[in-house]
Amino acid sequence: MEFPKPRQFRETSLLMYYLDVVFPLQYISPNNNCLGKREWLLTILTSARPTYYATLCLALLYKESLSTSCRSEQTLVWKREKTYYYILALQESQKLLGGLNKTFGITRLKGTVVALACMLQLIGFESSHLSRGDWRVHLLAANTLIPVLAEGWSTALQSGPPATSIWCELDESDFDSIDDQTSLSFEYLGALRFLSNSLAKIGILSCISVGPAAPFEDYGHLLDQPGLIQLEEVLGCKNWAMLTILEVGKLDRWKRQEQEHNRLSLKTLAMRAMIIEDMLTDELQKLPTSETLPDLITHIYAASIATYLHTVVSGLNPNLSEVQDSVCATILLLERLPDLQAVASVTWPLAVTGCMASESHKDFFRSTLRSYEATFSSLKKYDGVLEVLEDAWKKREVDTESPMRWEDLMDHHGLPVLLF
């Protein structure tokens, strides 16, 4: 009888650790009914080397974070193994991405899904406060996959309507097409939906950190795919609010382009901003009176988007009455969150609102973020958000003359913070 080699045993253990511990922290869902419906996940994580290695890398990153200072030898082992798998993941991901253009049809679509899984794992690794790397290169690579993802989803819809939720379960009908090589299996289709939603979430929320260079239209194209993107299920925020973030980002890009050519019309700027503000108002009026957690989270996003919009129009000036009005409105909504765990879904609103907070409101953000950090473990940048806020407040005090932009505030030691 032949047994696997010791390293294979270790890798299997790390993979189980990722599934049991890291994945729930990486993809915290505000809807507990969705938890556990990830039957497609193991297939995708083990289907190609780059995704597999990137997953092991994430597992080791989290193990390293839990090591105490008195166990330095253990920390060194986690760090050594993490670096080993990180290098392998980078090498294999380049091979995978480079080979996609040489494939066609269902093979290319499957390869694209696996490549997206790898890119998202690498983004998760680099953007974590535990590593603080440059996640932008991996997001850029993931964005190039959007056309194939959209085409694949369109093809999948021809076989019938999709499941109502992105958190779907294996059905008896899936066994009828087990040998079908012309369409996506349950596992690949489930991964395509979930990973596309994750890309949309990360991509849209990254726009404020990336600035006008962000591919707003690409993320809008993802949102336009019928039934594909349901951000309420991965973030707790409805699609329309995320679409509005893109619209504000595009307005910011347009304004800067017009300023560069000395042709900015304040009248046109005000009109375009009013259209976006009316969009927010109209959608908020449609929210039901019996508020659910996703409704509250969406309302929080809408209020903070108003702050974002005001600063794009008038500059990053916390002293403006309209800015403070939206900041106060957002804080009142944040105070209605049922528990600290819900903070996981509102990192972006906390950062945007906090950057423009008045002196009297700073302690609210400090206590909220510190309480979350002390209560929950996460791979996300919650401590990074507080550092961003503290830096933003200092910049406001020190430099009141130079015009500040959002990507300047989101910069932390030369690298942008990813708010997701």
Swiss-Prot record:
Subcellular location: Nucleus
One Gene Ontology MF term: transcription cis-regulatory region binding
Single GO cellular component term: nucleus
BP GO annotations: positive regulation of transcription by RNA polymerase II
InterPro entries xref list: Fun_TF
Record key words, sorted: Nucleus
Domain of life: Eukaryota
Function (record text): Transcriptional activator of all of the trichothecene biosynthesis genes. Acts upstream of the cluster-encoded transcription factor TRI6 and is necessary for full expression of both the other trichothecene genes and the genes for the primary metabolic pathway that precedes the trichothecene biosynthetic pathway.
Family stated for the protein in its record: Belongs to the TRI10 transcription regulator family.
Protein name in UniProt: Trichothecene biosynthesis transcription regulator TRI10
Species: Fusarium sporotrichioides
